[in-house]
Every structure is written in structure tokens, then in C-alpha cells.
Amino acid sequence: MMTHWPSPAKLNLFLYITGQRADGYHTLQTLFQFLDYGDTLHIEPRHDGEIHLLTPVTGVENEDNLIVRAARLLMKVASESGRLPAGSGADISIEKRLPMGGGLGGGSSNAATVLVALNHLWQCGLSIDELATLGLTLGADVPVFVRGHAAFAEGVGEILTPVNPPEKWYLVAHPGVSIPTPVIFKDPQLPRNTPKRSIDTLLKCEFSNDCEVIARKRFREVDAALSWLLEYAPSRLTGTGACVFAEFDTESCARQVLEQAPEWLNAFVAKGVNLSPLHRELL
């Protein structure tokens, strides 16, 4: 029985803010691609109905952690529909590699991995569509991780169209700051009226991120990281930051630049993949 479950990072290869709804949420167009790099969840089934997170995250109460919330949500919904075997529970621990507030989707990916893994281990039989619907109640980015395929996203990020962008190599760098998403989305100078375009048009354009100008203005570390990366390759912010990335055609080119990274920059090289490592394990 599989007990080690990948929880991959994602990149937003582009991100455009197309408007703001009456409820305050922003509408966007973005392109998600996974990385063959991320956290690892270790999940051991229990038979007493208990959910235990064995590796607490600093600053986050266990019951508020997306890992625990996802497990309890699946338990509740599967139980209410008569699909939860008696006594289903789990011990969960995490090898954390992805930074908090980094724009790599770590928390959302963790939640999705828990939903997919426990549905499999408990043999609940929920469909991917059902799991994605549950995931959306936990966060806008959770469904793309549940579905496990690179996707063009619209709406508030919940309308997903599978796509297959080129699988390039990336140097991903964390500049040492954490950016809470609301800091970017509440900034009055954030561009909020980028015209909507078709996916075909967007894939032919030079990629960019509307959040980048705000992140660079408010966080000098992000500005410094991007300034350094841009000397070597096309580079931009992922999500609302703080991570930035540069794209390369080969692993060797990416690693050559990594070797020159300044000491204050925490960086790694990973390949972009259109099929999530989580789903690759399940095939």
C-alpha cells in the first residue's frame, strides 16, 4: 500500500487580473503547470476514526491546517453519503520543502494530495469531479491539484481547461520573504482591467504576471531576485509571490545559473510537467 504521496509545486506561467466582482474576489486568467518538485505527505491509515497530523506547522494550529481540514472534509462528506468505511482515520506527516507564502501552491497542493490519497486509501469511491468540488471549498487553487493536469484557469481560478504547454526547466528562487495573498490583491495600484483573451491568443503572447509590479514595489527582496534572474533568462513572479522563476530549455543551462545564485537566494531547479507527480504515481 502506497504511504508516500507527492504534493507538487505549481507555477503560474502567466497571470492576468481581468476584473473584480462585487464580493471582492478578482477574476483572472492564468496558466498552471506543475513542477517535479514539492512536499511529500506520509499517510498511514488508522482504524479508530482519528485524524492526527504528526508534524505541526509553525504558526498554524493543527485544526486550521489545510491538511487536517481536507481530511475532515472528506471524512464528513463520505460519511454523509454512506461511502466511508467504519473507523477510517489517518496519521499524516509532511516533509515540507515548499515555502509558506511563496506562490508555489504548497498549502493547496497539500490539501489536494490528502483528498486524493485518503479517497484512495479509505476506498470511498468519490469521483475526481466530487473531490475537485470539495477542494474548491478549501481554496481556489485546490481543484487544479486534484485534477492533476496543467490547466488554463478563468473565473476566480475555478474554471479549468486542460492544456499542454511546453515542459521547460525552471530555476525557482525564494527571496526570503513571505507575501500574504491579500497584500497584493488589496493594493489599490494592482492592475484590475487586463482585457480577457482566448487561450490560443494568450499562449502566443509573451507571458507576464499582473501581480509582479506590486510585489516588486512593496518587497525589495522580490525586486532584487527578479533583477538578478533577468540577467540570465526570461523571468517572472509566480502567483502573488514571493517566489520568482526563470525558464530554460535544458536542465544544464538552469543548473549553470543556479551555481551562480547569490547566498541570500534560496533556489532550486525543477522540470515543468503537465501531469502532476501525484497522479503519475497513481497510474
UniProtKB/Swiss-Prot annotation:
State whether it acts alone or in a complex, and with which partners, per the record: Homodimer.
Keywords of this protein's UniProt record, alphabetized? Answer: ATP-binding, Isoprene biosynthesis, Kinase, Nucleotide-binding, Transferase
This chain's function reads: Catalyzes the phosphorylation of the position 2 hydroxy group of 4-diphosphocytidyl-2C-methyl-D-erythritol.
The species is Salmonella typhi
Pfam families per the UniProt record, alphabetical: GHMP_kinases_C, GHMP_kinases_N
InterPro entries (UniProt xref): GHMP_kinase_C_dom (IPR013750), GHMP_kinase_C_sf (IPR036554), GHMP_kinase_N_dom (IPR006204), IspE (IPR004424), Ribosomal_Su5_D2-typ_SF (IPR020568), Ribsml_uS5_D2-typ_fold_subgr (IPR014721)
Which NCBIfam families does the protein's record reference? Answer: ispE
Q: Which family is this sequence assigned to?
A: Belongs to the GHMP kinase family. IspE subfamily.
A GO molecular function held by the record: ATP binding
Name-wise, this protein is 4-diphosphocytidyl-2-C-methyl-D-erythritol kinase
Q: Where is the active site?
A: K10, D141
